Amino acid sequence: MQSAAQVDLIEELSLAVGAAHVLVDDDLRAAYEVDWTGRYQGPCNAVVRPNSVEEVAAVIRICAVYDVTLVPQAGNTGLVGGSVPRPARSGARSAIVMSLTRLTRLGRVDTAAMQVTAEAGVTLTTWRESAHNAGLDTPVDFAARDTATIGGAIATNAGGSRVLRFGTMRRQVVGIEAVTAKGAIVGSLGGLPKETAGLHWPSLLAGSEGTLAVITAARLRLVPWFQHTATALVAVKSIESGIRLLAALRRSVTSLDAVEVIAPTAMRLVSDHIGQPPPVSSPETALYVMVDCADHSDPSEQLLDVLSQADGIVDSAITTDAVQRKRLVAFRDRITEAIAAASTEVGVPTFKLDVAVPLDALGDLIKVAQGAADADGCRLVPFGHLAEGNLHLNHIGASHPERIADTVLSAVASLGGTISAEHGIGVAKVPWMSLIRNPADLDAQAAIRTALDPADMLNPGVLHPQGT
């Protein structure tokens, strides 16, 4: 039964956004209270769906008055528990989920400036379609493009397959609009390419995971649309062979768009899931490397030249045909889907780590990760972004995920790497932040957060332990 204060809170929220957009029934809230992995979940009093930056500000001010926490959420495709409420515990404040899925306005593409303004609920696919309609393209892409949104991609500083060429989401944000914990609207959507007037809101909020302000819109950079593409799937004898291939590609292929890595376990899993045999295969395969090139003319000649001279290749397939390329890319894009299906079969949510190390340490990382998985008795399925030394380590049927994390993340830190390359910290990796950040660094980050949100209202427990 709701208290009088809770009833009043719901009434005020309903006045702010409309009663139809304040979801209080258990069955309506359920999908917003659990994340995509199924591993992280927590209860909320209500899900509130504002339709404008003014409504976002009003909701935040109401939450402040009633001393409830607020969890910003859009596509809810996060993998580290940062987009859902924290588990219920004695004495904890109640939570409101703010769903930004109604903020879907997309401005006219400015083809001269190569920019567009998008609200936080616009999906990456919609962003890309808008750019394509104007003869341009988007610089960030990843498999969850149909549901992942602009707001979430900025909040986590998302990466994806095109980081090699264009950088992470932070580099694409040339203007931002957000609402602070005081309900104040800050930032600018002007998109000036040169501006040095004080602190840069886009840089501050990218990667802040909803802890400093709620992102409501952004002015985004666009890039040329290279309509001639070539994709190669290459089987190599060793991780060292893959790294040498990467170096050769970087030196010689000016159209290089992405260089991905797929472990044989991941290739077998996705192959079984989609019902297609791998396009390349050999008993000698230690690793698969997927290469994407894109240009204004056929980029395959440079790519073929490098592949013909590279050592350690045991098999390869290359295509410029759109249908065949889509088939090749499916072996990368549907890995996460295949992992989720396999985890459903064993009845245990996938335990995921997203790490990066210097390229010369990748071999050591893979050995440590496999050893930790073997000790646990679970199935390790690695894939990722070779150019950035970024591996997604997926554990199917893990019995003791914390032990795996301790082993792997400690090794990552000792190898000079990071415990989060693109998925963010969320709540999942907070206990290991001290591996890569010294106390002064953590104190400074906490001070920034306290200055903007002294009541710890916005996404408490994310990036820092709750209450710090």
Tell where the protein language model's regions lie, with residue ranges.
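Activity-critical C-terminal alpha-helical subdomain
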Residues: 184, 430-468
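Residue-level signal for inorganic ion chemistry
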Residues: 13, 63, 121, 183, ...
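Conserved, mostly hydrophobic/aromatic
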Residues: 63, 210, 453
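N-terminal accessory segments
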Residues: 1-36, 66-68, 310-327, 414-419, ...
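N-terminal flexible segment immediately upstream of the FAD-binding catalytic core
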Residues: 1-61, 78-114, 143, 266-277, ...
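FAD-binding subdomain of flavoenzyme oxidoreductases
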Residues: 105-260, 457-458
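C-terminal substrate-recognition/cap domain of FAD-linked oxidoreductases
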Residues: 24-32, 224, 230-235, 241-403, ...
